[in-house]
């Protein structure tokens, strides 16, 4: 009984004191509710764009980070399993994704959303044929034409084709069948693209001026898909296409004459101990100013390890065919490098769900050193930057 009375008295004292404090506060200050607001525009400056696919169902998102220190500046969101592209000026994001009745399954539609980057706002939507490939993101799955009039969208049902969207008209103008071929590599002039075929050749599609017609031409065999398969990831070096194989061989190709031709094949890891191979998804990052290729790598390479996180990034001199430097990195699955004389390298890691910034030192044979890191919120394999 005494214990119960003591508890009751303590409770009464606490209530009384709280009432006195509340009364005193009421006399001295007036409660002002907090006003929540949003910025009309992001802070100016160059950005890093990271596409976060949501493989657990629900919306994907593209996050915008400051290229200087990776401060999160903004984001836009779409449906599931998104693919993205960014305009050359960095002011527009094109996001293709799926919207399903049961989040990740059921009936649905595939939609192209076009966003204004400075304001993070949706400008327009275009419903696409319900055929878009729902695959781990790669830049080769969604590409702009050289003048950014057309957008090319990779389809797989599993039959493969490419949807051509006229961005000026805001509509789909044709679907180009490409059986047995996958990936989109736009020509540098006019309207058209090449694609990788399952027999080791490439097919180049040349489109008419209005995007509604096409002609195609197939190349000779470029690589052996059984003994030396190449990644979807690519970049351009002095007009040529660059691809890297699972076994770290660099394929340099020309598409200038309307058909893909081999220029050279260079084994990067030849003579290096440790059975090193390419690792990740976005594995081809070329710096134009210095003619240096950056590739994420890992030791003990074997079948099935090609998508694992990289422990090193190699800087490779394409002209002299020389390995310049091997830098330790943070379990990266994708990289991107800027084109300046003193480049910056960015990377993403699925394992840690982080995006990283690395400073590159041309005076130290293009060694990279971590300068910043930030959370990227989920499963990301692709990234790019803007001026």
Listing of model-derived features with the role each one plays in the protein:
Residues 66-69, 117-119, 166-170, 207-210, ...:
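Short loop/turn segments that connect beta-strands within beta-propeller blades
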Residues 27-34, 68-76, 80-82, 121-133, ...:
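A short beta-strand motif characteristic of beta-propeller blades
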Residues 31-40, 78-89, 133-143, 178-190, ...:
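Repeated scaffold domains used in trafficking and secretory/extracellular systems
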Residues 45-47, 89-91, 147-149, 189-191, ...:
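Short coil/turn segments that connect the beta-strands within blades of beta-propeller domains
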Residues 120-162, 169-185:
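Asp-box/WD-like beta-propeller blade repeats and closely related beta-sheet repeat scaffolds
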Residues 54-58, 99-104, 158-159, 199-202, ...:
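Short glycine/acidic-enriched loop and turn motifs that connect beta-strands
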Residues 42-54, 95-109, 295-310:
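Short, conserved, GDST-rich strand-edge loop motifs in beta-rich repeat architectures
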